[in-house]
A protein has these predicted regions:
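Solvent-exposed, flexible loop/coil residues
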Residues: 45, 77-79, 99, 126, ...
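Terminal amphipathic alpha-helical/low-complexity segments used for targeting or macromolecular assembly
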Residues: 1-66, 182-186, 192-205
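Conserved catalytic-core motifs of eukaryotic protein kinase domains, centered on the activation segment
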Residues: 119-121, 125-128, 153, 187-188
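Generic preference for well-ordered secondary structure
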Residues: 18-21, 25, 39, 51, ...
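Left-handed beta-helix
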Residues: 65, 70-71, 76-79, 84-85, ...
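Generic anion/oxyanion-binding catalytic loop in active/binding sites
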Residues: 23, 126, 131, 148
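Short, glycine/charged-enriched secondary-structure capping and boundary segments
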Residues: 124, 130, 175-176, 190-193
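Generic detector of leucine side chains in alpha-helical contexts
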Residues: 3-6, 30, 39-41, 58, ...
Length: 205
C-alpha cells in the first residue's frame, strides 16, 4: 500500500484501499512516525530553517523555505497537509489532517487553532466510525487565535476568522466571520492592487 492510496482512502469511503488488509497497520506506523517527528520538533529549539526541514519530513512534502512555525505543533496524521508559501503558524496549533488540509500562500494562523477534518458518526451503533472531509484555507486568509475550523470548510482569500470562532460552513472571500457558530460580521475592503507584492513578515519573524 502507498501513502497516496492511503490519502485517497480518506477522501473516498468507497476507495479500494479501505478494504486493503495492510491499511490499519500502515496507518498506525505513519501516525507513530509523526509522533516521533513532532517530539523532535517540540522538545528543543530549532532555527526557522530546521523547522522547514522537520515539517517537510512530517508531511512528506517539500515545505517552502518561506514557511514559518512557532512550536509546539501537533498533527494527528501529518501526511495530508499542504502548505503554500509565506505561511505563518503560531504556537499551539493542532491539525487533524486525515481528510486533507490545504493552506494557501500568505495564510496567517494564530495561537491554538484547531483544524479538524474528521467527525464521528452520530448513530450510537456507529459512533466509533469516522467520516472525513477536507479543509481548504485560501491565499492570505487570517485565522484568529483559539478558533476551530471543522471538516468540509473552505475559507476564502483575504478573509478573517475572528479569535475564538467555530467555523462550520464556508467563509466567503474578503469577509470577517466570528462567533459560535461563526457568522458574517463585515466585508474586508480590498486595498491591494492585483500584482502588488505583499510584505508578509517585514523581517520581524
Amino acid at each position: 500500500m502507498t501513502l497516496e492510496e492511503l490519502r485517497q482512502s480518506f477522501a473516498d469511503e468507497n476507495h479500494p484501499a479501505n478494504k486493503n488488509p495492510e491499511r490499519p497497520d500502515f496507518f498506525r506506523e505513519l501516525c507513530q512516525e509523526s509522533r516521533r517527528i513532532e517530539m523532535e520538533l517540540n522538545s528543543v529549539y530549532h532555527t526557522p530553517e530546521e523547522i522547514v526541514e522537520i515539517m517537510s519530513r512530517l508531511t512528506r512534502r517539500k515545505v517552502d523555505s518561506t514557511f514559518r512555525l512557532f512550536p509546539p505543533f501537533t498533527a494527528d496524521f501529518g501526511k495530508n497537509i499542504v502548505f503554500g508559501k509565506n505561511v505563518f503558524v503560531n504556537a499551539g496549533c493542532r491539525f487533524q489532517d486525515q481528510g486533507g488540509i490545504t493552506i494557501g500562500d500568505g495564510v496567517l494562523i494564530g495561537h491554538n487553532v484547531v483544524l479538524a477534518t474528521a467527525t464521528h458518526d452520530l448513530a450510537p451503533s456507529k459512533s466509533r466510525k469516522l467520516h472525513y472531509k477536507p479543509i481548504v484555507i485560501r491565499d492570505n486568509a487570517w485565522i484568529g487565535s483559539n478558533s476551530v475550523i471543522l471538516q468540509g470548510v473552505t475559507v476564502g482569500e483575504w478573509s478573517v476568522v475572528a479569535a475564538g470562532a467555530v467555523v462550520v460552513r464556508d467563509v466567503e472571500p474578503y469577509t470577517v466571520v466570528g462567533g459560535v457558530p461563526a457568522k458574517f460580521i463585515r466585508k474586508v475592503d480590498n486595498d491591494v492592487e492585483a500584482g502588488t507584492p505583499v510584505d508578509y513578515f517585514a523581517g520581524h519573524i
